[in-house]
A protein has these predicted regions:
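ATP-dependent adenylation/nucleotidyltransferase module used to activate substrates
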Residues: 1-113
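Charged/polar, solvent-exposed surface patches and flexible loops
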Residues: 37, 53-60, 140, 153, ...
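Catalytic subdomain that performs nucleotidyl-dependent activation
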Residues: 76-79, 83-85, 99-175, 181
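Short, intrinsically disordered, charge-balanced linker/junction segments flanking boundaries
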Residues: 184-187
Length: 187
């Protein structure tokens, strides 16, 4: 949902001819079809760059370079965060190919509030149109922009671990947003 709404806001601000959707699956990911659908809906060009083989090669090379006495093998959390960092490096390479374009960060206030992002991964970017918006507000904007309901309200996940964001963090975004409003605004 965040990428969908950030892309729509960029189209509103800049025009569809100045926005490019970049999909970076790690092998086969079922949510790539949704990303292509939103690119069509927004009439923006898109690229698909599969990072799966790069990810596998990097994991292998890191394991081979490891010193068994001082370095553990690639633990699950390291492997979970690595694709986000590969994606960000890829986005900046693509941006450089398009007359030094800018990379959009899709993190929202709710994620930032609890530190739910990968350093130098999905938390990076040149500007952050959603950074001061809770998930509830992001959803409202998506609805106001007339974006497809199923893409705006789909269950958020990283697309890699097989778990939803809420399963990973242990509470719902609705609960988190209520807490943020209570603490920040004293409601």
């Amino acid at each position: 949902k965040d990428s969908t709404i950030a892309a729509a806001l960029c189209v509103e601000a800049l025009g569809a001819d100045r926005v490019i959707g970049v999909m970076m699956p790690q092998g086969h990911q079922k949510d790539i079809a949704d990303a292509i659908d939103i690119c069509r809906f927004l009439s923006i060009p898109n690229l698909t760059i599969n990072i799966g083989s790069t990810f596998q090669t990097l994991c292998y090379e890191i394991d081979m370079a490891g010193d068994a006495d001082h370095m553990s093998s690639m633990e699950p959390m390291i492997k979970t965060n690595l694709p986000a960092r590969l994606r960000m490096a890829t986005l900046y390479a693509v941006a450089a190919l398009y007359s030094n374009s800018r990379v959009v960060n899709t993190s929202n206030l709710s994620e930032r509030y609890i530190g739910y992002s990968t350093k130098y991964g999905d938390g990076a970017g040149d500007f952050s149109p959603l950074s001061e918006l809770t998930v509830r507000e992001v959803l409202m904007i998506g609805d106001d922009l007339g974006l497809p309901y199923d893409l705006v309200h789909k269950t958020p996940s990283d697309g890699m671990s097989g778990k939803s964001d809420e399963e990973k963090i242990g509470f719902t975004y609705d609960e988190l947003d209520k807490y943020i409003l209570y603490v920040e605004d004293g409601l």
